[in-house]
């Protein structure tokens, strides 16, 4: 396929045009009086939403340069959604304003690398100022309030606060679609770890880029799996059972990985491979935790177990496993309760006997994983109309969970763009010169953009609001 190549101003303007088209469609939803956007669907009724990342995902542009520009802003919205669960529209507005000011200065002859250094120094200073402003979120009521705002639903906020209260602030909370009305909270045995699928081809939900396995077998191996001949006997047994397979191993590569991916794409066999969490002895211990929670065995030659000889009796089981690119959550493992309790007691004893702060911290993480369990929020619907939109409701709850966890970790600040504007006062302390100072000034101007956008969507007096918020002491979080 022939490539279209552009340089300098033509390339920059093409990228900016795509960014502006996407950002202009998204930013009208900002604020308490933000507008809704109607999204056409290939089939069925159109979707009405004010969720920034949902709008961004739907935008596809014809011009190749504009398409690249739009994709860059999509990535901004998506990363914000993944980390914080909210604030995607604000992030889009900031990105648009920063790019606009940056390109204006580049066109005027500024050095792009010096601008970049100035932007990075300014962003670091602003991040520090925002953290200083932040109020801690500690009580159940504060968590419920934060999650309620994100989900635009008080009941969802209270349920998330209840879930965090039961499994701890570092605990695993997962959301499942439920075939009935309303919301329900269930606490089950299970765990999560920070390793995702090895290949994106394993994803079963391409929109969310996650894989979901119902009632799977779980192979736990403390070694690399590369030779498909070693894996084939076990694969045939699992395929005969009609169940999906989750493979947790040091690595899955070569023929073995290719075979799993090809069978998944063809629809012959549903499986997901993930790398084992941790390293060295810690990995061995965490694999042992997973084995006990799921009722399986760790396949390792150290204990005389070889992959080619493994049967279904050595595999773990769970009611459900959800895997994203970054993490794996095992829900309701089939492990024996007495063995799980014994493992908890063993880890607690190791914590008491440990002299190393680092080791103690890692043991505490393992203890939380094994003993804390998994909180499952079952998302039904309040009405028959909502029942048709259950998937969107599930995504909204997942975003609210991430939002609540981010608030607990780093605190909350004044909303409405006020905190960003007040954080810009930190620029008075930055001692930058030349194009680095110009880059920092671009950040300062971008920080004003969200607060200027909110009144414009509400058809209000933007200039008056901006001046008052910049100077009002009550606006400080």
From Swiss-Prot:
Quaternary organization: Forms a cylinder of 14 subunits composed of two heptameric rings stacked back-to-back. Interacts with the co-chaperonin GroES.
Cellular component GO terms held in the UniProt record: cytoplasm
Keyword Ribonucleoprotein recorded: no
InterPro entries (UniProt xref): Chaperonin_Cpn60_CS, Cpn60/GroEL, Cpn60/GroEL/TCP-1, GroEL-like_apical_dom_sf, GROEL-like_equatorial_sf, TCP-1-like_intermed_sf
GO molecular function, one term: ATP binding
Function text: Together with its co-chaperonin GroES, plays an essential role in assisting protein folding. The GroEL-GroES system forms a nano-cage that allows encapsulation of the non-native substrate proteins and provides a physical environment optimized to promote and accelerate protein folding.
Enzyme Commission no: 5.6.1.7
Keyword annotations of the record: ATP-binding, Chaperone, Cytoplasm, Isomerase, Nucleotide-binding
GO BP: protein refolding
Enzymatic reactions: ATP + H2O + a folded polypeptide = ADP + phosphate + an unfolded polypeptide
Group of enzyme by EC: isomerase
Pfam families: Cpn60_TCP1
Positions of disulphide bridges: none
Binding-site list for ATP: 29-32, 86-90, 416
Major place of residence: cytoplasm
Descriptive protein name: Chaperonin GroEL 2
Protein location: Cytoplasm
Similarity annotation: Belongs to the chaperonin (HSP60) family.
């Amino acid at each position: 396929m022939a490539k279209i190549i552009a340089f300098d101003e033509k390339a920059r303007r093409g990228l900016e045009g795509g960014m502006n088209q996407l950002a202009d469609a998204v930013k009208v939803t900002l604020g308490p009086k933000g507008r809704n956007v109607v999204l056409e669907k290939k089939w069925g009724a159109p979707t009405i939403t004010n969720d920034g990342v949902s709008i961004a995902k739907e935008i596809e542009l014809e011009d190749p340069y504009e398409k690249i520009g739009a994709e860059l802003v999509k990535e901004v919205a998506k990363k914000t959604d993944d980390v914080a669960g909210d604030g995607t529209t604000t992030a889009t507005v900031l990105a648009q304003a920063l790019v606009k000011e940056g390109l204006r200065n580049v066109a005027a002859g500024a050095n792009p690398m010096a601008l970049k250094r100035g932007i990075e120094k300014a962003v670091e200073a602003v991040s520090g100022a925002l953290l200083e402003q932040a109020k801690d979120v500690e009580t159940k009521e504060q968590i419920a309030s934060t999650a309620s705002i994100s989900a635009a639903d008080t009941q969802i906020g209270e349920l998330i606060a209840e879930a965090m209260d039961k499994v701890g602030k570092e605990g695993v909370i997962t959301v499942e679609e439920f075939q009935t009305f309303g919301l329900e909270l269930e606490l089950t045995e299970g765990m999560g770890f920070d390793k995702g699928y090895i290949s994106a081809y394993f994803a079963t939900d391409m929109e969310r880029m996650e894989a979901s396995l119902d009632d799977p077998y779980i192979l736990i191996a403390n070694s690399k799996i590369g030779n498909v001949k070693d894996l084939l006997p076990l694969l045939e047994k699992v395929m005969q059972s009609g169940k999906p397979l989750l493979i947790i191993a040091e690595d899955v590569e070569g023929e073995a990985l290719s075979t799993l991916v090809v069978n998944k794409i063809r629809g012959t066999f549903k499986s997901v491979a993930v790398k084992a969490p941790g390293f060295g002895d810690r990995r061995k211990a965490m694999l042992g935790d997973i084995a006990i929670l799921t009722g399986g065995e760790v396949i390792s030659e150290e204990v005389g177990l070889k992959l080619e000889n493994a049967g279904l009796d050595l595999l773990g089981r769970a009611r459900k496993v959800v895997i994203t690119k970054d993490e794996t959550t095992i829900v309701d493992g089939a492990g024996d309760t007495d063995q799980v309790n014994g493992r908890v007691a063993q880890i607690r004893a190791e914590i008491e006997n440990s002299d190393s702060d680092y080791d103690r911290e890692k043991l505490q993480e393992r203890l939380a994983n094994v003993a804390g369990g998994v909180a499952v929020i079952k998302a039904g619907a309040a009405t028959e109309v909502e029942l048709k939109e259950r998937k969107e409701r599930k995504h909204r709850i997942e975003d609210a969970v991430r939002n609540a966890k981010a608030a607990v970790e780093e605190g909350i600040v004044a909303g409405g763009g006020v905190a960003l504007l007040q954080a810009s006062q930190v620029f008075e302390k930055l001692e930058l010169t030349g194009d680095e100072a110009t880059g920092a000034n671009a950040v300062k101007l971008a920080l004003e953009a969200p607060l200027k956008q909110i009144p414009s969507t509400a058809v209000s007096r933007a200039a008056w609001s901006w001046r008052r918020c910049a100077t009002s002491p009550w606006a400080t979080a």
